[in-house]
Structure formats: structure tokens, C-alpha cells
Amino acid sequence: MRSFAVKLFLTVIVVAGFGSALPAAQPDLTFPGETRDQWHGHLRHRFTFRDHAAWVVEPAVARPGHPWSWCLIFPDAFTERCAAPQLVAAGFHHAFIDVGNTFGSPAALEILAAFHDELVRRGLAARPALVGISRGGLFAHRYAAAYPERVAAIYGDAAVCDARSWPGGRAVGRAGKGSPADWATFKQLHGLADDAAALEWTGNPVDTLAPLARAGVALIHVVGDADDVVPPAENALVVAERYRQLGGTIELIHKPGVGHHPHGLDDPAPVVAFLIRHAGGAGDRSPGPRDGAR
């Protein structure tokens, strides 16, 4: 009996002492009806989720906790300059679901949240790094404001942070060109009856930063200082000033003399390093953005 007790004690000690070295469970990324191809040299799973085209890229060797980056729109724009392939090479998964030109509307956020739930259920980290390119800034920041505890970081690139600037062209400084057709779509999707209602709307990223700061969401924004489509002075620079006042973490990278294009950086290493630092750890594997939503 004493021999059995000693063996049991030693077994408990070994498991307690070395359990962290045991291989972690791998994400289940085999989706119903999926097809597979290569994305920048890595395996990509392509599938349909709630009638929306979606995909997830697997790294060759995943980082502990299975962190991931999530591009909200324009996943094929300036890809090599916007850090995603480099993050996958560093062990991130990378995901996308096509919700169209929906400007972070409530209906789009519902689909994004359900997709997020599904990927967490399948084994990815609960807090991804969001990538918001151009109008994707509205998508990324609005999603993070709705679910701040479910986002680790945001990378915004020439990112729209105030719809009055773009597509409205009606921010205080009126520095941006605006887009009348997109402005009309934006108002319709957000249930805003007219210009007056849209100008008074309080759902812009510049106005919804407090929840992100409280949740510790780290922000990095890359801006072209000569951007006259999404002027930094009406968008990312406002976010930076307000986020710092709230005690949030934000880094700005300026591109002197550069306009709205090209997005990204000749060498995106600073963005990659920032996202690894703030979103590449073991990760929070708590439930998805809406507890119990599946």
C-alpha cells in the first residue's frame, strides 16, 4: 500500500511539474465543404460561413496559444506590405470573412462576432489582432468597441476613424475628399436618416475609445502624411491624442510625403514586432465574444 502511495505521489509531481511541456491541442480547422489552396506559401482553408465566403491560413509552426490576425476588408491589398504573411511566418494564423462594404454596421458586427466565436471554439486564441485597412478602420474599431475584451490589438493602415471625414468629407477641417455614394451607403446601413443625423452619430472610432483603453487593446496606426482621402489629422491623429489621454497604448508610424496609397510599409517589421508583442503570447482562451453564442 505504501509503495502504491509513493508511486501515486510521484506521478502527481511529474504531471504538475511537466504538464506545461505537454503538446497543446491543435485547432480543428477542417470546415464543412472547404477547399484548400496556398496563400503566400501556407495552407489556406476556404469555406462558407453563414453564407459569407471565409478563409483561415495555417502557419507551418503555430505559436503557443494559437494567436491570429484578422483582416476585416481588403485582404489582398498590398498584402506583403501590411504584415500578414510575415505574421503567419512568425506563427500566427490569419483569417478573413467577407461581409462586404458594410462600414462596421450592426448587421456586419453580428456576422463577425459569430465567426469569431467559431474560430475560438475551434481552438484559436480568444483575442486576435484586427487589421483595418482604409475603410477597414471603421470595421476594426467598431468591432473592438463592441467586444473590447475579445481584441488584443488593432493595426490600422490609412484607417478611417471618423466617417464624417470619409466617406462624409464633412469633418471640421473638411480636408478629405469624401465619397458621396459611400456616404449614402454608410447612412443607410447605420439607420441614419440624413446628414444631420450622421454628423451627430457617436459611433465613430474617435468617439468609442474608452472601452478599448480599459480593456488594454493596443493600437498601431500607419499613416501617409499627404493622405487627402483619409487625412490623418481627422482620423488616426485624433485617435492617438485621445487614446493617450485615456492611458491607452498606441504607436504611430508616419510616412512623410505619402498619400493614401500605397498601404503598409516597405518593411513591415515594426508592425509585425508590435503585434507579436501585444497579441502573440499564449493568449486568453476564455469564451467567445458573446458568452454561450455558438
Please state what every model-predicted region is:
Residues 25-64, 178-185, 281, 288:
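A domain-start/cap signature at the N-terminus of enzymes
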Residues 78-95:
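Short amphipathic alpha-helix adjacent to the substrate-entry channel of hydrolases
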Residues 123-134:
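Alpha/beta-hydrolase fold nucleophile elbow
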Residues 173-237, 241-244:
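The feature captures the conserved acid-bearing segment of alpha/beta-hydrolase catalytic domains
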Residues 229, 233-292:
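C-terminal catalytic histidine-bearing segment of alpha/beta-hydrolase fold enzymes
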